[in-house]
């Protein structure tokens, strides 16, 4: 199978499938849920709304080509509203309540620091859209 567009999403989706199978998150259903955790309101909305739109576009493209191993990707979009503590709350909701296999989001360092304990506790998988400045 050869992909022309959105190769990052495809690689991430493949990794997500392997991780979900390894962690027991793979389901017999016809969809794989993924969380989208970008601010759609508040001060960061101007930068992050387009990232949400891009993810939805890439997911639609992937689904139009048959999905991932014959399963459709189902996005679950939440708005942490540029509120750093709310990022952790929304991440917990995505992983625990919505049972997503992975989350795409957390553009800022402070949002990633906010969600890190949640992802570690729940053994979640986070893909963030830029290089980390590191520590």
Regions inferred by a protein language model and the residue ranges of each:
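Residues that mark the start of a beta-strand
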Residues: 31-33
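Sec/Tat signal peptide C-region and signal peptidase I cleavage site
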Residues: 23-28
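Extracytoplasmic ligand/sensor domains, especially the bilobed periplasmic-binding protein
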Residues: 99-135
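Short, well-structured alpha-helical segments in soluble
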Residues: 81-101
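Signal peptide-proximal N-terminal region
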Residues: 29, 52-75
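Extracytoplasmic "Venus flytrap"
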Residues: 35-56, 78-85, 107-110
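N-terminal secretory signal peptides that target proteins for export/translocation
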Residues: 1-6
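Bacterial N-terminal signal peptides
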Residues: 10-21
């Amino acid at each position: 199978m050869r992909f022309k567009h959105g190769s990052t999403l495809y690689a991430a989706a493949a990794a997500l499938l392997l991780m979900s199978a390894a962690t027991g998150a793979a389901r017999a259903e016809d969809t794989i849920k993924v969380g989208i955790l970008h601010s759609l309101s508040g001060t960061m909305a101007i930068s992050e709304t387009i990232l949400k739109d891009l993810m939805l576009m890439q997911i639609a493209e992937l689904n139009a080509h048959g999905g991932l191993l014959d399963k459709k990707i189902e996005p679950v979009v939440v708005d942490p509203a540029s509120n750093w503590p709310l990022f952790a709350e929304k991440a917990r909701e995505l992983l625990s309540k919505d049972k997503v296999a992975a989350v795409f989001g957390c553009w800022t360092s402070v949002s990633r620091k906010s969600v890190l304990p949640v992802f570690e506790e729940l053994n979640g998988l986070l893909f963030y859209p830029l290089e980390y400045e590191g520590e």
